[in-house]
Amino acid sequence: MISEPALDRLSAMFQGPDVTGTRYQLLSVLGRGGMGVVYLARDTVLDREVALKIVERPSEDANEARILARLEHPGIVPVHDFGELPDGRLFYATKRVRGDRLDRWMASGRDLSERLGVFLRVCETVAFAHAHGVVHRDLKPENVMVGEFGEVLVLDWGVATTPSQSAASQRRIVGTTEYMAPEQARGEAVDHRADVFALGAMLESIAELAPVLAIARKARSDEPASRYQDVQSLAADVSRFLAGRAVEAHRERLVDRLARFGRRYRLPILLVLTYLVARILLLWLVHV
């Protein structure tokens, strides 16, 4: 924990928006994006560090805060507070999470089972949001964080859409091009299958094995009707791959089946081969 004098000095050196009248003391910038800035701040009442988000479009700030408040899930950062700055902009405070963005975490030499395990946890969180009528619309590795305690968090719900939003808001083109479903890029109304597309794009960056790429390609089909129809179906195919079973999206060749069989039953096969080699050696020694 940083000492009180050090916090005061750090705050004095940092020039941020005026937060007079709030319970927060700004310390530094945690991140910037097209929607606004996230600051590291100190909650002077509870004496703890928080992430304080301030965006330029108040309606979207309120939208994200409301969505986060209603989605109580281990994979979604909880909202602590919501309010208005002296200049009229809205802010909200959330738990300050320490960890790595998913793209940086994957670059640190994680094995395939670890990476796919994290991907499945992202799917679980997104499926939970879909069950509550929320479509994220900007899923990408940069918006997923792996925390220092192993938690996997889906961030940045500022452009998420809900059934209660206006048709114009739901059709607004938002997101990141390489993860954006075609219907989203065309400015059409989207449903949860736009997030399935984005998850498929994320999956492509995780592994280059044929079954995994087949899953990703199915999730990224141009037509929503050709994709997995929900996140649970996508996750189920990934789980089948991890369990050594055939995946629905991939038509296996004989060599693929043999390789999968070998991965699934590696230890028994090694034991049988060891036994056979030992028997052959024994027979050879007896007849020498």
What are these model-derived regions, one by one?
Residues 27-33, 38:
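Protein kinase glycine-rich loop
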Residues 42, 98, 117-120, 126-127, ...:
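C-terminal lobe helix-coil module of Hanks-type protein kinase domains
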Residues 42-49:
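Conserved N-lobe loop of protein kinases adjacent to the ATP-binding glycine-rich P-loop
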Residues 56-70:
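AlphaC helix of the eukaryotic protein kinase fold
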Residues 82:
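Activation-segment/catalytic-loop signature of the eukaryotic protein kinase fold
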Residues 87-101:
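Conserved short submotifs of the Hanks-type protein kinase catalytic core
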Residues 101-111:
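AlphaC helix of the protein kinase catalytic domain
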Residues 149-183:
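Activation segment of protein kinases
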